[in-house]
C-alpha cells in the first residue's frame, strides 16, 4: 500500500518543526491525517486567458476541503504569446514551458504533496503542467479557464478573433475605423483565444488523454456551467487520491491513464480537429516526461488514416470554440472517431473507468440525456467581461448535424486527409509539420524559389516592403529551439503574407514554429534545425523547393553532392558555422543561453537533452 507522501512532513516527533510551520498556514490537528493536495494556479493579469483565475484556486480548495482533503495553492508564471509576439519577448515563450514544469515539480516535491490539481489555460501553461504531471506521476486532474467568446462588430460579416485583428492591422485597404473596430471587438471576454489555437487545442487534448473532465476544452470561460467543472475537479481529486493511497489503485495515476494508447487518442483528436501544430511539440515533450515511446513516426502514421472531422477558426471563419461546444465538444469528436474505429476506447480516464463509458454518458448523439444536452447548449452572451461564470446563455438547439455541421462523421468528413501532416525530405530529414486544415487544397503541391532570411524580424520587414513575391518559398531559419533561441512563433509573417494578398501564393518554411492562429502553407518544426546542422541551414535564395503534402515530402532541388559540398563549406567556417551570416540585433539573456545549450530540435519536443549533463 502506498504511503501518503505528505507523511514525510506531517508525522513523527522529528517533524515537529515542519508541523509547526504547517500550523502557521492554518492546518489543525485533524488535517495531519488528510491528504495534502497541491493546487497549481496560473492566475496573472498579463493574460486574458488567466485574468479570471484569481479566485478559482480557492474555489477548488474549498471543495477539496469539503471532500476530506487539505488544499494548498501556489502559482506558476504564464506568458501571453499574443502580447509577446513579433518582438524579442517571443524568445521566452517556449522556454517558459520548462520553467512551469520545473516550478510545479519543485513545489510539489519540496512540500511532499500527495496529489495535484492543475488550473491552466493558455499556450505554454497547460503543456508545462502536463509535463510536470507526467514527471511526478501522482494523482492529478486538469481544469482550464476555458475559451473566450468570439468577437462581433457591425463592420464584419463574420465572428472575429485575434488573428483578424493582426491581419487587418497591416491591410492597406482597411480604414482606420475598421482597424479600431476589429481591435476593440476581436477579444471581447476573458478566456483563451476563441479559435482552435494552441491553448484551446491543448485543453481539448487533456480530455482525450483522460486527465480532465468533459467540457474542459470547449465550455466558455464566461459561462456559469464552468463553475461545476472546478467544483467537480476538487471532489474528484480527493476521490482518486484516496483510491491510490488507501486502496492501492495505481490505475488513477497519470502514467496509467496517459498511456501510449491515450497519446494516440489525443493525436487522433488533434488531427481530426485541425489543432495547432504546437500540440505536436507538447505531446512529444509530455510523452518523454512519462516514459511513453510516442514519436513523430507515430504522428505520421496517424495523420495518414485519421480524417478531418471538425474545422474551426483559424481554418474557417464560420466556427469558433463556442460552436464546437454546441456540437458536443471534444466528446463529440471522440465519439465520431470511435464510431469510425479510430480510437482506443478501453483506456481509463479521471472521470470514468474507460473512455467508452465516458463517451456513452456524454455523447450528445447517443446518450439521450437532457442534462448532457443542456450542458452542451451553453453558449456566448456577447457581453464584454473579464469575470468567470458571469452569464448563463444557452443555444436554443444543439448542433447534432454530422453531415454539414461543425463536427462531422467519418463518412462526411471535411477531408479524408487529417488536419495535420508530417513531411520529410532532404531539407527535413527528421521531419517537419504542416496544419493541412489551414492550407487551401490548390497549393497542397507547391514549388518555388527560396527567399532566405535568418530571422523573423527580417522576414516581416521584407514582406511588408514588398520584397517577397508570389510563388516564393520564404525560408526563416536559425529560429529553432537552439538557434533562436526559444523557437519563436511566426504568426506575424504568416498574417502579413495574408494582408499583402499572398496567403495562397507563397509558402513559408521555418525551423521555428507557428501560432495556433496560423493558416496557409506554413511549414514549421524543420528538424534538425539550422543551428543543429540541419540542411535548412544550407539553402540559398533562389534554390527551388518542392512541397508535396499528399505524398508527405519536402525537398530542395539539389543533388546529394551539392548538399555535401555546401556542408563542407559550412564546416570550414569553424566557430561561425551553423550561425546566421550577419549578427542579429537580438539580446539573448543568460537564461536563454542556458536553455539553448540543452534544447533539442522540434522532432524531440524541444525538450532538454539531459544526456549532455552526464
From Swiss-Prot:
It comes from the Bacteria. One of its GO terms (molecular function) is magnesium ion binding. The modification N6-carboxylysine is found at residue 124. Pathway: Amino-acid biosynthesis; L-isoleucine biosynthesis; L-isoleucine from 2-oxobutanoate: step 3/4; Amino-acid biosynthesis; L-valine biosynthesis; L-valine from pyruvate: step 3/4. Its cofactor is [2Fe-2S] cluster; Mg(2+). One of its GO terms (cellular component) is cytosol. [2Fe-2S] cluster binds at residues 122, 193. Binds 1 [2Fe-2S] cluster per subunit. This cluster acts as a Lewis acid cofactor. InterPro entries: Dihydro-acid_dehy_C (IPR042096), DihydroxyA_deHydtase (IPR004404), DiOHA_6PGluconate_deHydtase_CS (IPR020558), ILV_EDD_C (IPR056740), ILV_EDD_N (IPR000581), IlvD/EDD_N (IPR037237). It catalyses: (2R)-2,3-dihydroxy-3-methylbutanoate = 3-methyl-2-oxobutanoate + H2O; (2R,3R)-2,3-dihydroxy-3-methylpentanoate = (S)-3-methyl-2-oxopentanoate + H2O. Mg(2+) binds at residues 81, 123-124, 489. Disulfide bonds: none annotated. One of its GO terms (biological process) is L-valine biosynthetic process. The keyword Iron applies. The active site is at residue 515. Its EC number is 4.2.1.9. Transmembrane segments: none annotated. The keyword Amino-acid biosynthesis applies. Belongs to the IlvD/Edd family. Homodimer. Functions in the biosynthesis of branched-chain amino acids. Catalyzes the dehydration of (2R,3R)-2,3-dihydroxy-3-methylpentanoate (2,3-dihydroxy-3-methylvalerate) into 2-oxo-3-methylpentanoate (2-oxo-3-methylvalerate) and of (2R)-2,3-dihydroxy-3-methylbutanoate (2,3-dihydroxyisovalerate) into 2-oxo-3-methylbutanoate (2-oxoisovalerate), the penultimate precursor to L-isoleucine and L-valine, respectively. PANTHER family: D-XYLONATE DEHYDRATASE, D-XYLONATE DEHYDRATASE YAGF-RELATED. This is Dihydroxy-acid dehydratase. It comes from Cellvibrio japonicus (strain Ueda107) (Pseudomonas fluorescens subsp. cellulosa).
